[in-house]
Swiss-Prot record:
Lineage: Bacteria, Bacillati, Bacillota, Bacilli, Lactobacillales
Gene field: glyA
Family: Belongs to the SHMT family.
Subunit structure and binding partners: Homodimer.
Keyword terms: Amino-acid biosynthesis, Cytoplasm, One-carbon metabolism, Pyridoxal phosphate, Transferase
Cellular localisation: Cytoplasm
Protein known as: Serine hydroxymethyltransferase
Length: 415
């Protein structure tokens, strides 16, 4: 039985109220969190389908349960579409998340205690790239690399120097808060010079890679991991890609039975839908607009005294701002903007002096507002609203003006 809204509300009013409140929040808030997006009705329909009832441990054609003919078709569709989308020979669509994908990739590539290079959190790296509180930092010996202190860009010569000093078994390229292009060819040269493997986490830029708006890491990386949401605009989940048959077998074993049991076939179906959408030429137009909107916002922020664009701007879907010089930290900025219907997140910056719970900066992404229909004019308006709120963070009258303007903008572009 499939509940409609009225049935759901009647059956579980408390849960329905919470879901409805979130629906209203999404309708009324300008979403700038770089890792969030707005999926299609088709993606949601697939994820809410009867496939959620089916257990399917194993892989298509090699399951540990019967009755898997239909889910085999579903999973193979997702695999084949991902191969076409990214030019990969082998794809595993079963990871429940990006973190699960990274965990399995590490298991396939290295041994516990091995030395790994990963991007420092303050420079834009992810928890799974070696943070001491994360499984990655607890299981493997991660050595961080950062960015040039002056340019705040990846310093490939410095990364090479570190690699030669520590002789890693693996180098991880990719980030969760880096706004510039990543040169995967240079990373390949570095890994080859020390006899290491190269893993690329393209979770944030997968949508850009799919449309050639960012260089594809697959020709250079031994393994590529990603999420399927963010710029790819699919369901929350993970994926692993490689062109190496031997590694593909190790990856499959690392996912099942290594780190997961039954795959979420309803989510895999939603991934298949998202990949089909991403193969449509309209998706390339969408990504092009995402980049235009990001750059339009960057141009506006650059005009504001007291705000600093980290790395001088953006080549992708996100940008980072230092807000501390305005007399407000990242957490305070996040809470302040949330109160005026603008959602973003606090973010550490390369020269960070505050704790991860406060931070000196914020991260801003254009994927969700672009899905909503915003173009450059609206993106510039959004940047102006954010700037006005931050500059006037103690002025309730100005903040009320921002709140009303933000609501008006979301009403003009309903979900």
């Amino acid at each position: 039985m499939i509940f409609d809204k009225e049935d759901f509300e009647s059956f579980d009013p408390e849960l329905w109220a919470a879901i409805h409140a979130e629906e209203i929040r999404q309708q009324q808030n300008i979403e700038l969190i770089a890792s969030e997006n707005i999926v299609s009705k088709a993606v949601m329909a697939a994820q809410g389908s009867v496939l959620t009832n089916k257990y399917a441990e194993g892989y298509p054609g090699k399951r540990y349960y019967g009755g898997t003919e239909a889910v085999d078709v579903v999973e193979n569709l997702a695999i084949d579409r991902a191969k076409e989308l990214f030019g990969a020979k082998f794809v595993n669509v079963q990871p429940h998340s990006g973190s699960q994908a990274n965990a399995a990739a590490y298991m396939a590539l290295i041994q516990p205690g091995d030395t790994v290079l990963g991007m420092d959190l303050n420079a834009g790296g992810h928890l799974t790239h070696g943070a001491s509180v994360n499984f990655s930092g607890k299981t493997y010996h991660f050595v961080p690399y950062g960015v040039n202190p002056q340019t705040e860009l990846l310093d490939y010569e410095e990364i090479l120097k570190i690699a030669k000093e520590v002789q890693p078994k693996l180098i991880v390229a990719g980030a969760s808060a880096y706004s510039r292009l990543i040169d995967f060819a240079k990373f390949r040269q570095i890994t080859d010079s020390v006899g290491a493997k190269l893993m690329v986490d393209m979770a944030h830029i997968a949508g850009l890679v799919a449309t050639d708006a960012h260089p594809n890491p697959l020709p250079y990386a031994d393994v590529v991991t990603t999420t399927t949401h963010k710029t790819l605009r699919g369901p929350r989940g993970g994926m692993i890609l490689t062109n190496d048959e031997v590694l593909a077998k190790k990856i499959n074993s690392a996912i099942f039975p290594g780190t997961q049991g039954g795959p979420l076939e309803h989510v895999i179906a939603a991934k298949a839908v998202a990949f089909k959408e991403a193969l449509d030429p309209e998706f390339a137009t969408y990504i092009e607009q995402v980049i235009k909107n990001t750059q339009a916002m960057a141009d506006e922020f650059a005009k504001v005294e007291g705000l600093r664009l980290i790395a001088g701007g953006s080549d992708n879907h996100l940008l980072n701002l230092k807000v501390l010089d305005l007399g407000i930290n990242g957490k305070e900025a996040q809470d302040l903007l949330d109160s005026v219907h603008i959602t973003l997140n606090k973010e550490a910056i390369p020269d960070e002096t505050l704790s991860p719970f406060k931070t000196s900066g914020v991260r801003i992404g254009a994927a969700a507002i672009t899905s909503r229909g915003f173009k450059e004019a609206e993106a510039r308006k959004v940047a102006q609203l954010v700037s006005n709120a931050l500059v006037n963070h103690d002025n309730q009258e100005k903040l009320e003006e921002v709140r009303k303007a933000a609501l008006e903008l979301t009403h003009q572009f309903p979900l």
